[in-house]
């Protein structure tokens, strides 16, 4: 009796464990794109969903699109979902999940993968826009440099004009002072002459002394020597 009870208890525990295991959700898978999640239009890309178990069924879904669904069974732990001739409408966020043969519950959803589909026309326009922006920047920089150069030349020219005008005014001032200096020197020489003439104690100038000396010499030559009368009396 006791043995039968124990066997039934063990059987119940095992069945309960199996049921619990079936209802347990598997861990979430991983989703990635190959060769890249950013692709050009009309090209191909493959989304790969990888699970933690083998012999599973995978499902691929798209965010904000409840009607999109792809299922795929695989004996491995990975499934591939190829996309060919991509269109802009294929862009969006994708996620995947899986379930094992022993479990009827889907696993947790994988992290969302953002698939970006670029337009070739936009890619062709992008370099031209970059080139235009660079050209505009170079043109603006050149204009600013030219303006600064002209401003520097103008400032240098104005400074040179100011210095030359200062030199000319200085020269004019010096030239205007020369006649005044000459007149002052002439007045000074006249004053010196007058002072010399007034400094003589007898009040006789150099010209008067010369005239009197000449007249005295002439009177001395006209007078006869004192011995001439005696020589005449003896001769008679």
UniProtKB/Swiss-Prot annotation:
Regions of this protein lying in the Extracellular compartment: 17-135
Ranges where the Ig-like V-type domain occurs: 27-114
Modification comment: Isoform 2 is N-glycosylated.
Glycosylation sites: 44, 55
Stretches the record annotates as Disordered: 166-200, 215-236
Disulfide links within the chain: 49-96
Keyword Signal: yes
Gene Ontology biological-process entries: immune response-regulating signaling pathway; immune system process
Annotated motif ITIM motif 2, positions: 229-234
Keyword annotations: Cytokine, Disulfide bond, Glycoprotein, Immunity, Immunoglobulin domain, Membrane, Secreted, Signal, Transmembrane, Transmembrane helix
Placement of sequence motif ITIM motif 1: 204-209
GO MF: cytokine activity
Annotated signal peptide: 1-16
Free-text tissue specificity from the UniProt record: Expressed on myeloid (neutrophils, eosinophils and monocytes) but not on lymphoid cells.
Protein name: V-set and transmembrane domain-containing protein 1
Organism: Homo sapiens
């Amino acid at each position: 009796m006791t043995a039968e009870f124990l066997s039934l208890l063990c059987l119940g525990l095992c069945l309960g464990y199996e049921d619990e295991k079936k209802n347990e959700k598997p861990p979430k898978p991983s989703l990635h794109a190959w060769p890249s999640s950013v692709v050009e239009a009309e090209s191909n890309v493959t989304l790969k969903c990888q699970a933690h178990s083998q012999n599973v069924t995978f499902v691929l879904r798209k965010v904000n699109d409840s009607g999109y669904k792809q299922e795929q069974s695989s004996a491995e732990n990975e499934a591939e979902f190829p996309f060919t001739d991509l269109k802009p409408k294929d862009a969006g966020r994708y996620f995947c999940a899986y379930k094992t043969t022993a479990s009827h519950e889907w696993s947790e959803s994988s992290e969302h993968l953002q698939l970006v589909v670029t337009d070739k026309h936009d890619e062709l326009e992008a370099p031209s826009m970059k080139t235009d922006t660079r050209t505009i920047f170079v043109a603006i920089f050149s204009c600013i440099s030219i303006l600064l150069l002209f401003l520097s030349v103008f400032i240098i020219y104005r400074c040179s004009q100011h210095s030359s005008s200062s030199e000319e005014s200085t020269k004019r001032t010096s030239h205007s002072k020369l006649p005044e200096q000459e007149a002052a020197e002439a007045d000074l020489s006249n004053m010196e002459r007058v002072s010399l003439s007034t400094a003589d104690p007898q009040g006789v100038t150099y010209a008067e002394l010369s005239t009197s000396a000449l007249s005295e010499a002439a009177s001395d030559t006209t007078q006869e020597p004192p011995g001439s009368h005696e020589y005449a009396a003896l001769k008679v």
